[in-house]
């Protein structure tokens, strides 16, 4: 089965930055326990613009992790499946 991915974009103000970084750390810990890989990237030219990536080995694992997440994903039903390029 193909890997599954969801993406979320978040904008934070300079005053929210430290609190948001702590939130990202909590997300990383939670998703690691749920067997989901989590990454966060900040746009180089726009501080405070973040992309969060959630990847699991299958859509079911990803959906289950999102359903139990302490911080809900804005659109957990928008799931991308890996394209097999052979």
Predicted regions and their residues:
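Short S/T/G/P-rich N-terminal loop/turn motif that feeds into the first structured element of a domain
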Residues: 1-86
């Amino acid at each position: 089965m193909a890997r599954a991915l969801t993406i979320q974009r978040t904008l934070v103000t300079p005053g929210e930055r430290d609190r948001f970084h702590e939130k990202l750390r909590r997300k990383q810990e939670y998703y690691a326990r749920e067997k989901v890989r989590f990454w966060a990237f900040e746009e180089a030219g726009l501080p405070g613009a973040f992309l969060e990536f959630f990847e699991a080995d299958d859509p079911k694992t990803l959906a289950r992790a999102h359903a139990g997440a302490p911080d809900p994903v804005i659109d957990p039903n928008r799931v991308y499946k890996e394209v097999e390029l052979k």
